[in-house]
Amino acid sequence: MRRIDPNKLELEERVVAVNRVAKVVKGGRRLRFSALVVVGDKNGHVGFGTGKAQEVPDAIRKAIEDAKKNLIEVPIVGTTIPHEVIGHFGAGKIILKPASEGTGVIAGGPARAVLELAGISDILSKSIGSNTPINMVRATVDGLKQLKRAEDVARLRGKTVEELLG
């Protein structure tokens, strides 16, 4: 899979979560901040990243840099996704279903950020299991990675799109 150049896209950033994390040392606790950020161009490209630093703005900056390195392309049909898919990560699972136009993005917090920034405006989703922001984002991205266009599936099977869709 080829890498997507973030400089050629107009990316929008959304901070999904900021956590205060502690490392316990002999003299007490060392506090740092961990940030989870989703970036996307609302036109079929989305990515997420994490960053950790002493201060919140630095953690967010690092997370944005990381997210730009992890961009994926999402096949979109009209305003929704081509087919139903289930994304997994750890104990988190998310079901993504295509929806008719005008439905809107029906998704909880972290998954909503990923889907909106990917440019999907009509979708149904249900998260099952772990609902921590990082697991939800990773499961959603996993689901989006599994999506295939009808043309790609037809080419893989050596058929035409008409034969495939019947």
UniProtKB/Swiss-Prot annotation:
Q: Where is the S5 DRBM domain?
A: 11-74
Q: Could you state a single Gene Ontology molecular function term?
A: structural constituent of ribosome
Q: Which GO BP terms sit in this record? A: translation
Entry-linked InterPro entries: Ribosomal_Su5_D2-typ_SF, Ribosomal_uS5, Ribosomal_uS5_bac-type, Ribosomal_uS5_C, Ribosomal_uS5_N, Ribosomal_uS5_N_CS, Ribsml_uS5_D2-typ_fold_subgr
User: Which superkingdom heads the taxonomic lineage of this protein's source?
Assistant: Bacteria
User: What's said on domains?
Assistant: The N-terminal domain interacts with the head of the 30S subunit; the C-terminal domain interacts with the body and contacts protein S4. The interaction surface between S4 and S5 is involved in control of translational fidelity.
Name the UniProt record assigns to this protein: Small ribosomal subunit protein uS5
Give the species this sequence originates from. Answer: Geobacillus sp. (strain WCH70)
Which gene codes for it? rpsE
